[in-house]
Amino acid sequence: MRKQIEIFTDGSCLGNPGVGGIGVVLRYKQHEKTLSKGYFQTTNNRMELRAVIEALNLLKEPCEIILHSDSQYMKNGITQWIFNWKKNNWRASTGKPVKNQDLWIALDSAIQPHTIHWRWVKGHSGHRENEMCDELAKQGAENPTLEDTGYRQD
């Protein structure tokens, strides 16, 4: 039987584009692990995607996951839009290249071993774990140490 994991993620960007951060809370039974990372030049959407990728990359085996995020962009992208993007060689319905393609490809790969139930939570509404992730993401953004490889200003 697969481990049942609950994951909460958030991304933050001060400026958009600007410095950004990710915040992650992973819960397995009674154990919680947190993660905060800061990036130099990036965007809020890239941080939302990167938070989920980083969280999934912490897992050592295939898991049953409930993943909570306040990002409609991430949730809709991975549960709806990505299928057509892949079919259309990573082109949006406008014919233009999909933004953040590098991270969408990484996220698509990161979800493969797992069964994931995607949950959207309203941001800044007092949801304990979402507020924790928001704070962790802001801490990361205030102390950037990493380059957001793949970020380009279009």
From Swiss-Prot:
Organism name: Actinobacillus succinogenes (strain ATCC 55618 / DSM 22257 / CCUG 43843 / 130Z)
Binding site for Mg(2+) 2: 10, 134
InterPro entries named among the record's database cross-references: RNase_H, RNaseH-like_sf, RNaseH_domain, RNaseH_sf, RNaseHI
Entry cofactors: Mg(2+)
UniProt protein name: Ribonuclease H
A GO term from the CC aspect: cytoplasm
Function noted in UniProt: Endonuclease that specifically degrades the RNA of RNA-DNA hybrids.
The entry's keywords: Cytoplasm, Endonuclease, Hydrolase, Magnesium, Metal-binding, Nuclease
Taxonomic path: Bacteria, Pseudomonadati, Pseudomonadota, Gammaproteobacteria, Pasteurellales
Superkingdom of the source species: Bacteria
Enzyme class: hydrolase
